[in-house]
Amino acid sequence: MRVILTACFLLVFNLTEYSYGKTQQHIFDVYILGLKLGRLNYAVEYKNNSYSAAGNLRSTGLFSAIAKYSFEASSQGKIERGVFKPKYYYERSDTGRRKEQKILRYFDHGIELETKKTAKPYWQDPNQQMDALDPMSAIIFILRDQTETNVCKQNFAMFDGIRRVEIRFVDGEETTEGHLRCKGIYTRVGGYSAKELKDGTNFPFYVNYQIENDDYRVISFQMTTNPRAR
């Protein structure tokens, strides 16, 4: 998940949630500095040892009249011993000023990147990123329900075809509301220009879970970023 928003970026779980068999749909409202920016909507289907997911982030309300933004992504892969193994990733984004589209195809020997952008020397080699999740898989991995044994302990890498980041949870504490608040660090590893790196390398984030029996369900995700970070 790229850092695509500024200042205080907050995802708040919307109570609208659907489940059709093994297909689950989740909706989060997106806020910046207390103002509703848009909505993240994604669905995941688990079948045997495979998963498929699709989601979109769109600006809504007053913000959409000022700066329209849309991000769509889909991913398919396998689950091996609880670990996501992507096989295909598609992404399309429109910031109002720039449109982008990319596809990642995963093979035994490496990853094939399809994009119209001209490669830069600092881009990460896709064939060296087989251990990393694609952005859509990363969204699922962060926002899915957790158990007591693995909550606040997630640690993985993400690769979007150009950039590699590490997402690491470092600790957690119970809040006065009886929720669990986990702290994590989003670290830029490679694929960024020198100018981009001046905006920062490490970005803290927080995930709040509601505890239901032995399940921990995300109710909010918060990240504070530099105004130009991504």
Sequence positions of predicted segments:
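Sec-dependent N-terminal signal peptides
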Residues: 4-12
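C-terminal segment of classical bacterial N-terminal signal peptides
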Residues: 12-18
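A generic signature of intrinsically disordered, low-complexity regions enriched in glycine/proline
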Residues: 18, 129, 135-138, 149, ...
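Acidic, serine/threonine-rich low-complexity disordered tracts
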Residues: 20-106, 144-230
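Surface-exposed, polar helix/loop patches in the mature regions of secreted/periplasmic/lumenal proteins
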Residues: 85-139
